[in-house]
């Protein structure tokens, strides 16, 4: 089958090459999917660069989310079913396998190619904003990187859950995009201090942060008493100085998580919760995947280069069939 390999094991976007590799064979409890489209995510870039190796037993091929047609079924899935699925790897290919419990039906009337942009982002937002961050109706969420794939999904899911959203983005155009996606307040991080904006509205309850570094102390200031700071990445630096007394005084919770290394049972639990709560939001149009641009599979290198530039709003995709 056609797949994308990293020439030399690591490198820049130009290291991504089309290759012929054996088609995967599903084990017991797994399904085989004929891939129509795959999402491109930051962890794919980190893996390509050699910083984020796949967990034990996961395919070396990039790709953490796909949508397509079931070829070999298991559990509730039968050949011909249209699904989107969370993968431990292997999505940049014509065929992929996954635990049958990590696949979900295409919600509503979404096109299969758009549904491929759901699993990684929706699972991440649900686990971090709603479980670790415990965002409740009436509370306020601050989302950094608001026009990223994670950001646009976090805005929509928080609004669907009855929360307010303060979104930060770089530049006035992206700030406007965040407002159009439903954010109540948008902060241009290039010209405004988001912690000042947050304090002016009484603080925020949850911060979803993928930046780290210089944002850390500002996040502490932005949070109101009892607030929760949730990290999902540290693109701006992973080491910070912790103001312990301030954290104690404000009774803050500092947490974070990754998705890919979680066990199969934990991912199955997340999938069930996502289908129960989030899938109805998508079916009724409250939440939708925002696709910025799609590239053919063979142009995976161009897709990575585009994502790294940071000009996108929403998801970058690969079309396979």
Predicted regions and their residues:
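C-terminal hydrophobic helical "lid"/dimerization subdomain
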Residues: 1, 267-321
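Short amphipathic alpha-helix with an adjacent loop that forms part of the alpha/beta core around
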Residues: 193-202
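Glycine-rich beta-strand-centered segment in the early N-terminal region that forms part
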Residues: 22-40, 49-90
């Amino acid at each position: 089958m056609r797949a994308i390999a990293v020439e030399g094991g690591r490198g820049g976007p130009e290291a991504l090459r089309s290759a012929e590799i054996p088609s995967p064979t599903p084990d017991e409890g797994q399904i085989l999917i004929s891939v129509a489209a795959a999402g491109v995510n930051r962890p794919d870039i980190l893996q390509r660069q050699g910083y984020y190796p796949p967990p034990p037993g996961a395919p070396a091929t990039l790709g953490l989310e796909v949508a397509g047609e079931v070829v070999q079924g298991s559990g509730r899935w039968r050949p011909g079913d249209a699904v989107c699925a969370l993968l431990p790897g292997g999505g940049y290919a014509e065929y992929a396998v996954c635990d049958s419990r990590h696949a979900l039906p295409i919600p509503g009337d979404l096109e299969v190619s758009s549904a491929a942009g759901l699993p990684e982002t929706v699972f991440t937002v649900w686990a971090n904003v709603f479980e670790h961050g415990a965002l409740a109706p009436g509370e306020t969420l601050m989302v950094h990187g608001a026009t990223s794939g994670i950001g646009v999904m976090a805005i929509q899911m928080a609004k669907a859950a009855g929360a307010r959203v303060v979104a930060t983005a770089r530049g006035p155009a992206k700030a406007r995009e965040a407002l159009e996606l439903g954010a109540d307040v948008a902060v241009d991080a290039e010209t405004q201090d988001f912690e000042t904006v947050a304090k002016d509205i009484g603080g925020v309850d949850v911060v979803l942060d993928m930046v780290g570094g210089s944002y850390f102390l500002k996040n502490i200031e932005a949070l109101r008493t009892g607030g929760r700071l949730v990290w999902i990445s540290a693109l701006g630096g992973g080491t910070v100085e912790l103001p312990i007394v301030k954290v104690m005084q404000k009774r803050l919770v500092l947490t974070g998580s990754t998705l890919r290394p979680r066990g199969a049972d934990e991912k199955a639990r997340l999938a069930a919760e996502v289908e129960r709560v989030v899938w109805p939001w998508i079916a009724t149009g409250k939440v939708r995947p925002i696709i910025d641009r799609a590239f053919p599979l063979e142009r995976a290198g161009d897709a990575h280069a585009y994502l790294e530039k940071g000009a996108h709003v929403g998801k970058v995709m690969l079309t396979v069939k």
